[in-house]
Amino acid sequence: MPEYRSRTTTAGRNMAGARALWRATGMKDDDFQKPIIAVVNSFTQFVPGHVHLKDLGQLVAREIEKAGAVAKEFNTIAVDDGIAMGHDGMLYSLPSRDIIADSVEYMVNAHCADAMVCISNCDKITPGMLMAAMRLNIPCIFVSGGPMEAGKTKLAEHNLDLVDAMVIAADDTASDETVAEYERSACPTCGSCSGMFTANSMNCLTEVLGLSLPGNGTVLATHADRRKLFEQAGQQIVAITRDYYEQDNVNVLPRSIGSKAAFENAITLDIAMGGSTNTILHLLAIAQEAEVDFDLKDIDRLSRKVPQLCKVAPNTQKYHIEDVHRAGGIYGILGELERGKLLDSSVPTVHSTTLSAAIAKWDIQQTSDDQVAHFYRAGPAGIPTQVAFSQDTRWPSLDGDRAQGCIRNVANAYSQEGGLAVLYGNIAADGCVVKTAGVDDSILVFEGPAHITESQDEAVANILAGKVQAGEVVIVRYEGPKGGPGMQEMLYPTSYLKSKGLGKNCALLTDGRFSGGTSGLSIGHVSPEAAAGGAIGLVRNGDIIRIDIPNRSIDVKLSDDELTARREAQNELGWKPAELRPRKVSAALKAYAKLATSADKGAVRDLSQLDD
């Protein structure tokens, strides 16, 4: 039977000093016999997805205490990718993921916590905490802050999100008044941005990974039903903590739940729902922490057989996350995948012995539980607010239409190939990633001359100045994990291509990455990156690039001899931008760049370099 980790600081005469300090935090005599559970919060007033989390850690803590354990809360950092977008602030976003993972490890191990509840929400916070959960391998449950409601305005027939505001702002034909109305309407409530962007994609994936409760990815931040998720997380973490330490049930540990099958289920869901390409980057990093052999080739294999069953903004203007919830949420999609024999539902979760049993209860197509139907009718109130759990609106009915609704069955899939694809070729020997869910059918095969830029700033300037022509492949290089450093998101370049009418007439190729809000022929994560000697650094203006998504290939039309000659010349010059960029790179970012791997490895730090 494993011993409670916390006994290191709470048991024995020699720990009198530690107990004295624990007492100063409010612990009493009988508390020293209880499990100590860390409540890992990420409240900040900088981020709309986290602005409402301040009191929610204590909500969870009170439930933990009612269930007979001790709760101790701490906070991590949280970067808002949308606010950090389009300037040097974005250099810090991806590195913050590893800082978050480290900070959770530091706090939990330093204080010998027995288990943890992770309260996350936005882009790098959920994956950072997932990395920590797999690294620590102690009982853990995730509960997110929830998605914001979609925006509404009389100026548009469809609901709005952040990307709509960005696109309209770059549209020269839009008046200042129209831009201001979109800006005021796009993000009406607290919560993670309302489309299937990175934050919501990752929170949905925690459900299929088995580390969160049903509805974690789709119940609105403003809805009263989400309060129940926080309360249940506090209760359930105590149950599984006792199950591990007192019954020796290792099946409740993150690495037991996060098996190879669970990671394959996660990417299967991601492909089926057309999630953000960032999820690939994060799943690869999380799998490494879990010591699971899961790589781009697994993702490539699954992308060829999993259909797209759900289409949500930014891939369509018709649906947002609130509509996915009305259609049965993530368990609605999982039910269709299970019926299509595309899921390994034998894996365990933190709330059910198997995923199959959970699907049987939570899939609206097969359950007879009226409470489940009531749960998935939770909808938006349309009232701007930063207050969690402030409304209890219900949709009048569920969206159970699997032929033409938000979630489709396999027979009526949006497409028989899923929403993500991995491409290989002489420009990306180790692969690159495209969100096919956002690519128009007319440009699934695309060939055009390269338009070289060596920073996101240069790409934006060229697009806005009208220098980018229809038919070109805009290359943004030296923006990878090392080269940026920090692997910036390219939401502004792709949004501006749209606003200039080039969304279906140009491609964008980068060793950087894309926001979950990106759509169009946007190919990122090119590996190896330019700064690591990748062939993307050898391409010149006018070189012809051929992209063939159906055949999963991407190549620059140059001979091997020409590429070899260019490589030899580049080796002499060094793998860096041709001209010095006006970019301030701090010591902290330089440290990240020194250890960072390319995107095909999840852009994690290669700590083996420290062994030399």
UniProtKB/Swiss-Prot annotation:
Keywords: 2Fe-2S, Amino-acid biosynthesis, Branched-chain amino acid biosynthesis, Iron, Iron-sulfur, Lyase, Magnesium, Metal-binding. [2Fe-2S] cluster binds at residues 122, 193. Its EC number is 4.2.1.9. It catalyses: (2R)-2,3-dihydroxy-3-methylbutanoate = 3-methyl-2-oxobutanoate + H2O; (2R,3R)-2,3-dihydroxy-3-methylpentanoate = (S)-3-methyl-2-oxopentanoate + H2O. Binds 1 [2Fe-2S] cluster per subunit. This cluster acts as a Lewis acid cofactor. Pathway: Amino-acid biosynthesis; L-isoleucine biosynthesis; L-isoleucine from 2-oxobutanoate: step 3/4; Amino-acid biosynthesis; L-valine biosynthesis; L-valine from pyruvate: step 3/4. Signal peptide: none annotated. One of its GO terms (molecular function) is 2 iron, 2 sulfur cluster binding. Its cofactor is [2Fe-2S] cluster; Mg(2+). It is an enzyme of class 4 (lyase). GO terms for cellular component: cytosol. InterPro entries: Dihydro-acid_dehy_C, DihydroxyA_deHydtase, DiOHA_6PGluconate_deHydtase_CS, ILV_EDD_C, ILV_EDD_N, IlvD/EDD_N. The active site is at 515 (proton acceptor). Mg(2+) binds at residues 81, 123-124, 489. Functions in the biosynthesis of branched-chain amino acids. Catalyzes the dehydration of (2R,3R)-2,3-dihydroxy-3-methylpentanoate (2,3-dihydroxy-3-methylvalerate) into 2-oxo-3-methylpentanoate (2-oxo-3-methylvalerate) and of (2R)-2,3-dihydroxy-3-methylbutanoate (2,3-dihydroxyisovalerate) into 2-oxo-3-methylbutanoate (2-oxoisovalerate), the penultimate precursor to L-isoleucine and L-valine, respectively. PANTHER family: D-XYLONATE DEHYDRATASE (PTHR43661), D-XYLONATE DEHYDRATASE YAGF-RELATED (PTHR43661:SF3). Belongs to the IlvD/Edd family. This is Dihydroxy-acid dehydratase. It comes from Teredinibacter turnerae (strain ATCC 39867 / T7901).
